[in-house]
Amino acid sequence: MQIQLHLYNTLSRTKEVFNPQDQANIKMYVCGPTVYDNPHIGNSRSVVVYDLLYRIVIKIFGSRAVKYVRNITDVDDKIIDRAELLGITINELTDKVTQEFHTNMAYLGCMLPNIEPKATEHIDVMIEIIERLIAKDHAYITDNHVYFDVLSAPNYTELSNRNLEEMFEGVRIEKSKTKNHPQDFVLWKPAKPNESTNMNFESPWGFGRPGWHIECSAMSYKYLGENFDIHGGGADLVFPHHTNEIAQSRCAFPDSTYAKYWVHNGFLTVNGEKMSKSLGNFITVRDLMDKDISGEVVRLFLLSSHYRRPLDYNDKAIEDAKKTLDYWYRAIENINVQKIDLPHNFMQSLLDDMNTPLAVKIINDYAKGVFIAKTEKERQLNASVIITCANFIGLMNQTPHEWFNSGVDSLYINELVNKRLEAKKQKNWLLADQIRNQLLEGKIILEDKSDGTTIWRKE
């Protein structure tokens, strides 16, 4: 039976069967970070969601058939402002934040994309596309800027499914007396006086830099061509970023449809509120790492809700994810687990528009199956299913011993355990009990075995 992936396509506003242009060459592009500040928990949701989609597509078509491109936006006004504020060079800032992004994503168990292009290394492709747009009367030069003519683009509002006036309500529009239409957006802008040369480049229209939207059109074209299969990003990118990408790419290449499937993940809030520095609820991935919260816990939290639905970060949600992983790891403890084929019901949940809440429930059901199993064979089968399914979605990459004892001083605990064993040999029951209670206060559980040895685990 042929495996079919169903994805909700924002472009058609329906769930569709994923039918790539070429099953031997699946093309996927995801908008990556703008490297001006450390990634926050909302940024990480997008990366984890598309990491899962990447894994699913690889499972169906094979790793050699999939090309996953995720860009680095290292040209942006926010980068200039941030570097100036910190008193460092632009390159120092972008290198530091890019490295932090990679560290954060490894912490969350994300696979690397096949290609991770930087905007600064593709200025020539951006210039090429802008020249095409000018030649086809979709862009114009004025006041040392190059603007895209929004009214020249067929079906400009197709992705957002709103009329032009509604789309721009509440959106900050760069005012210019020389723009043909207030909603026209910049493709190229001149450098400001005394501005860093690291963020500006020579072009046919003078020394300057590209607008944000042209960057992704250029990098997707460079590595995936005029047409590709999947374009992913956060719901906040539907307009204006993705809307403008479609417009300029289709106008530059009239025979192109650009991306066939548009996939968008929902917003993330913190304790029911929009995350912002002014509210004091801005949480970076580094903040979670510094609190010694396991990356697996954060990843499971991010997958606990359907990717298109809003997700709220709060202490209880993180605690629930930790308890769930504890339950799974406890279920496979002291069992000889083996990698097996993914069960049909689990795979079907992911093929149905990445229904991760159902996938998590299925793993929970198998964990319950371990504890109620009547035979060792049944326990082993259920435990093997747990580890196979969890590994597929990027979880349970530790042994139960490593999981339950992470963050503890094993040498110190072993020293106390040995000291207690010696006390028991000498029938010093008071000291033995004192050591047990001392470890218990640190949430370390001791278990005396019938052979005279003692094992320990974190509560």
UniProtKB/Swiss-Prot annotation:
GO terms for biological process: cysteinyl-tRNA aminoacylation. GO terms for molecular function: ATP binding; cysteine-tRNA ligase activity; zinc ion binding. Coiled coil: none annotated. Pfam families: tRNA-synt_1e (PF01406). Binds 1 zinc ion per subunit. InterPro entries: Cys-tRNA-ligase (IPR015803), Cys-tRNA-synt_Ia_DALR (IPR015273), Cys-tRNA/MSH_ligase (IPR024909), Rossmann-like_a/b/a_fold (IPR014729), tRNA-synt_1_cat_dom (IPR032678), tRNAsynth_Ia_anticodon-bd (IPR009080). The keyword Glycoprotein does not apply. It catalyses: tRNA(Cys) + L-cysteine + ATP = L-cysteinyl-tRNA(Cys) + AMP + diphosphate. Its cofactor is Zn(2+). Its main location: cytoplasm. One of its GO terms (cellular component) is cytosol. Its EC number is 6.1.1.16. HAMAP family: Cys_tRNA_synth. This is Cysteine--tRNA ligase. The lineage of its organism: Bacteria, Pseudomonadati, Pseudomonadota, Alphaproteobacteria, Rickettsiales.
